[in-house]
From Swiss-Prot:
<dbReference type="GO" id="GO:0005829">
    <property type="term" value="C:cytosol"/>
</dbReference>
<dbReference type="GO" id="GO:0000049">
    <property type="term" value="F:tRNA binding"/>
</dbReference>
<feature type="short sequence motif" description="'KMSKS' region">
    <location>
        <begin position="600"/>
        <end position="604"/>
    </location>
</feature>
<keyword id="KW-0067">ATP-binding</keyword>
<dbReference type="GO" id="GO:0005524">
    <property type="term" value="F:ATP binding"/>
</dbReference>
<comment type="similarity">
    <text>Belongs to the class-I aminoacyl-tRNA synthetase family. IleS type 1 subfamily.</text>
</comment>
<dbReference type="GO" id="GO:0006428">
    <property type="term" value="P:isoleucyl-tRNA aminoacylation"/>
</dbReference>
<dbReference type="GO" id="GO:0008270">
    <property type="term" value="F:zinc ion binding"/>
</dbReference>
<dbReference type="InterPro" id="IPR013155">
    <property type="entry name" value="M/V/L/I-tRNA-synth_anticd-bd"/>
</dbReference>
<keyword id="KW-0963">Cytoplasm</keyword>
<keyword id="KW-0436">Ligase</keyword>
<dbReference type="InterPro" id="IPR009008">
    <property type="entry name" value="Val/Leu/Ile-tRNA-synth_edit"/>
</dbReference>
<keyword id="KW-0547">Nucleotide-binding</keyword>
<feature type="binding site">
    <location>
        <position position="917"/>
    </location>
    <ligand>
        <name>Zn(2+)</name>
    </ligand>
</feature>
<feature type="binding site">
    <location>
        <position position="897"/>
    </location>
    <ligand>
        <name>Zn(2+)</name>
    </ligand>
</feature>
<dbReference type="Pfam" id="PF00133">
    <property type="entry name" value="tRNA-synt_1"/>
</dbReference>
<protein>
    <recommendedName>
        <fullName>Isoleucine--tRNA ligase</fullName>
        <ecNumber>6.1.1.5</ecNumber>
    </recommendedName>
</protein>
């Protein structure tokens, strides 16, 4: 064989089998940056239709995790696929830079603002810290192969962006959406600030569950509402609560106007309880002997007076729709300072809005019985007071979902404080937002219901914060009337110009007289900062409307499912409040990253997968393949085992590319491509299969179904290529003459296929696709990412794809029969066999048409097809209607092609070869038509 090896066209390529991604990827990334590939992509698409995917800004704090990678890689896949589709698809990344997490990190180093360091110096340190985090995250995002305008990002702490936040506030004021109020808001005691809905996490917490007696001041007026005219004795409306610390702020007991309430005679006293809850309430109180003495609707008790359980004041019975009979008593403790429903009821009944709790979470000094006690520790004291006064009817502990600060993970409270709000209803904003939601394409479609529900039920948006590091609310309010200055809109623009020049310190350093002159003595300067969700939420204004390379509205916003209450919501609210339209056409949502069992990733649980470790060990392309392989619309599982499975799939893809490249080692597309009419039928089939598959892949990219692309490409490599086409062409590629039509035919097909295949891969396996691209013969563009979807296909005459599908099926059955024969020890390789296929009338013509080339379909030394009627008795018929007979060949093995042929040894000059091989090495070009 040694003397004939040099006569074979054996594959040869510089494209390595071992990927070594952790080494090659950084080198390629450096090359992209040195060549300015992103800028060249933009230049290549100048004048094309734009596609804008607007990046939701990650928070500039800490290293990236797998959730960041999932999000940015998905976006990158979209941007690159749209670029291949001919769009001008710029990607401008962003960062969210103000807010508490950065403050906390800076506090650890320099102390709190105003104590060890001045607020101005503190803000400078925050800015410095955020900038350092952006540098870290920028490098980590780029390492993932994400292309974008990384050195011209939008950054919410940039002076021009801060100025635009202020201008956005001005627009919302102009449109009548801002109002100030003393309202209950989510308050984090550790933060010392109000928080938005998006900054609240719900976690399980153990709380006291108590029932408290509110006694009727005048039992008769209650009893007179019942037709039974019961005898007069003490009467109690019991309330149930899990927040005893709010009882000092109680101003009413709330009933539902249309719920039926039962009058329960328990002997010494009456109870009024929702009829549906009587049994559970009496059981809780340990009262077994009682009777129902009447029933009445809740509305009949309106305005009747009750005695506060431990203060001298009397409180009214009020009515509201939020009362239910799901739990409790049907009588709801109402503290307007400590809950949004309570507040609304208080407003409608003009109840006192008295807040006994200070910003530090302690009761004020004038609060009787509980002065100075932290509300988080007050429950025990309050229960003791209730017991002393014999008004504690029941007490136990309950495990329930409770709001916690997203940053501190500590329980939050509702606290009435002076704040600024975007009113959801004042200028019909809520309905306008709901109308816009209907115009947006939500993917998955459940996103529409989710955000609609949030908008319908959300309270007014508290946008003010009592923090140092944030964009200021540049407002002046009258010292007496508390009204905004009449020139507020003009003043806001003047401040915006100042901030654009000097940053937010321009406001904090400002002396009011500089803007107001003599008016300054009548106005207070507001020192609150704005909610960071407003910062990122107005990116549609500061970025999409102010960057000439972008458009408004964006084609796509794409973030995790938590952003329905976060960035999707704040962006929608601000855009509608500012100019009446949604900022996006389509909203895509992906799930959270979880472990293989669907559990949240956590360092403490030991299931955390470190992103940097994955990238350094496996390479970014393996991570990108993991992203593409999952249906991101659900939770996305990741683990070392899952990544290893993706690495295995990657190797199959890489090996397919390597095989194609290795067989093009002597191919010059400019001179060696043959005309379409000369292509062998198998090669025409392969090219047609690729064209059809490309259409499916492009459609999947357009529909953002990346997991389908992964499946299609993997199947293409494993089935269409690995077990069929590439297997069949080896004999022709290796043994026929170098410049023969037969060989150049499959090389022509492989050339077109590898170019198309590489572009299919590029949005997902970006580094590997570029590596393949640089190895493909011919004059190729500087980078694959400047290309379009492949369209230089040969014009192919009709190929009967169904016939080839049938041939593929029969081949699979023959392979099974060969394997069974091999297992019995009758043959070694398939080339040691001769096969007879007995086929039905449908399959037979497809097989006999191939003639002598049928053996190349099965890769056996001999093959023939006969009518199934000639099948030997006892030979099984397969599901595809054929019977297969395998026998060991009795002929000698050709030393060059390894086929066992009758004519081996008939040529005296080459006695070890079959006559086909003799011809191929002697200048005779073997003719093939099909395979």
């Amino acid at each position: 064989m040694a003397e004939y090896k040099d006569t074979l066209n054996l594959p040869n390529t510089s494209f390595p089998m071992k990927a070594s991604l952790s080494v090659r990827e950084p080198e390629m990334l450096a090359d992209w940056q040195a060549k300015g590939i992103y800028q060249k992509i933009r230049k290549a698409r100048v004048g094309s239709k734009r596609f804008i995917l607007h990046d939701g800004p990650p928070y500039a704090n800490g290293h990236l995790h797998c959730g960041h990678a999932l999000n940015k890689i998905l976006k990158d896949i979209i941007i690159k696929s749209k670029t291949f589709s001919g769009f001008d698809a710029p990607f401008v990344p962003g960062w969210d830079c103000h807010g508490l997490p950065i403050e906390l990190n800076v506090e650890k180093k320099v102390g709190k603002a105003g104590s060890k360091i001045s607020p101005r110096e503190f803000r400078a340190k925050c800015r410095e810290y955020a900038a350092s985090q952006i540098d870290i995250q920028r490098d980590e995002f780029q390492r993932l192969g994400v292309l974008g305008d990384w050195y011209n990002p939008y950054v919410t702490m940039d002076y021009h962006y801060e100025a635009n936040i202020v201008r956005a506030l001005g627009l919302m004021i102009k449109n009548g959406h801002l109002q100030q109020g003393f309202k209950p808001v989510h308050w984090c005691i550790d933060c010392g600030s109000a928080l938005a809905e998006a900054e609240v996490d719900y976690e399980d917490k153990t709380s006291p569950s108590i029932d408290v007696a509110f006694s009727a001041v005048n039992p008769s007026e209650f009893l007179n509402c019942f037709e039974t005219q019961p005898a007069v004795k003490p009467l109690i409306l019991p309330i149930w609560t899990t927040t005893p610390w709010t009882l000092p702020a109680n101003e009413a007991v709330c009933l539902h106007p249309e719920i039926d309430y039962a009058l329960i005679d328990a002997g010494n006293s009456y109870y009024i309880v929702a009829t549906d809850l009587v049994e559970s309430v009496m059981a809780r109180y340990g009262i077994s002997h009682y009777k129902t003495s009447g029933s009445a609707k809740g509305r009949v008790f309106e305005h009747f007076k009750l005695q506060h359980p431990f203060y001298k004041r009397q409180v009214p019975v009020v009515l509201a729709e939020h009362v239910t009979t799901e739990s409790g008593t049907g009588c709801v403790h109402t503290a307007p300072a400590h809950g949004p429903d309570d507040y609304l009821v208080g407003q409608s009944y003009q109840l006192p809005l008295i807040n006994p709790v200070m910003a530090n979470g302690c009761f004020a000094e004038n609060v009787e019985l509980f002065a100075g006690i932290s509300v988080l520790k007050a429950n025990e004291t309050i229960l003791a007071v209730l017991s002393e006064r014999n008004v504690l009817l029941a007490s136990e502990s309950i495990r329930h979902s409770y709001p916690h600060c997203w940053r501190h993970k500590s329980p939050m409270i509702f606290l009435a404080t002076p704040q600024w709000f975007i009113s959801m209803d004042k200028s019909n904003l809520r309905q306008a937002i709901i109308n816009e939601i209907d115009k947006v394409n939500w993917v998955p479609d459940w996103g529409k219901a989710r955000i609609s529900n949030m908008v319908e039920n959300r309270p007014d948006w508290c946008i003010s914060r009592q923090r140092s590091w944030g964009t200021p609310m540049p407002l002046f309010v009258h010292k007496t009337t508390r009204e905004l200055h009449p020139d507020t809109l003009e003043l806001i623009e003047r401040v915006a110009v100042m901030i654009e020049k000097s940053g937010i310190d321009a406001w904090f350093d400002l002396d009011s007289s500089e803007l107001l002159g003599d008016d300054a003595k009548h106005y207070d300067k507001i020192t609150d900062t704005m909610d960071v969700w407003l910062d990122s939420g107005i990116s549609h204004y500061s970025v999409l409307k102010h960057n000439n390379d972008l458009d408004f509205p964006a084609d796509v916003y794409f973030e995790g499912s938590d952003q329905h209450r976060g960035w999707f919501n704040s962006s929608l609210t601000t855009a509608v409040a500012m100019y009446g339209v949604a900022p996006y056409k389509t909203v895509l949502t992906h799930g959270y990253t979880v472990d293989a069992e669907g559990k949240k990733l956590s360092k403490s649980k030991g299931n955390y997968v470190a992103l940097d470790k994955l990238v350094n060990q496996h390479g970014a392309d393996i991570l990108r393949l993991w992203v593409a392989s999952t249906d991101y619309r659900h939770e996305v599982s990741i683990s070392e085992e899952i990544i290893k499975r993706n690495a295995d799939a990657y190797r199959r893809i890489r090996n397919t590319a390597r095989f194609l490249l290795a067989n093009l080692f002597d191919f010059n597309p400019a001179s060696d491509c043959i005309e379409a009419k000369e292509l062998l039928e198998l090669d025409r089939w392969a090219l047609k299969r690729c064209q059809l598959l490309q259409e499916e892949i492009i459609t999947a990219y357009e529909n953002y179904h990346f997991h389908l692309i992964y499946q299609k490409i993997h199947n293409f490599c494993a089935v269409d290529m690995g077990s069929f086409y590439l297997d069949l062409i080896k004999d022709r590629q290796y043994t026929t003459a170098k410049d023969s039509i037969a060989r150049r035919s499959c090389q022509t097909a492989m050339y077109h296929m590898v170019k198309a295949f590489t572009i299919w891969l590029a949005p997902i396996l970006s580094f590997t696709a570029e590596e393949i691209w640089q190895t493909i013969p011919g004059n190729n563009s500087e980078s694959i990412f400047i290309e379009h979807w492949y369209d230089a296909w040969p014009i192919i005459d009709a190929v009967n794809m169904e016939d080839w599908e049938q041939l593929h099926i029969v081949r699979d059955e023959v392979n099974k029969a060969l394997e069974e024969t091999r297992q019995r020890g009758e043959i070694g390789s398939a080339l040691a066999a001769e096969v007879t296929v007995y086929a039905d009338a449908k399959a037979l013509p497809k097989l006999t048409r191939l003639g002598e080339e049928l053996r190349f379909l099965f890769i056996t030394s001999e093959a023939k097809a006969c009518p199934i009627s000639q099948s030997p008795k006892g030979l099984a018929v397969t599901d595809c209607g054929v019977s297969i007979q395998v026998t060991a060949s009795a002929h000698e093995k050709c030393a060059r092609c390894w086929h066992r042929r009758e004519d081996v040894g008939q040529n005296q000059e080459h006695p070890e070869l079959c006559l086909r091989c003799v011809g191929n090495i002697s200048g005779y070009h073997e003719e093939r038509l099909y395979i």
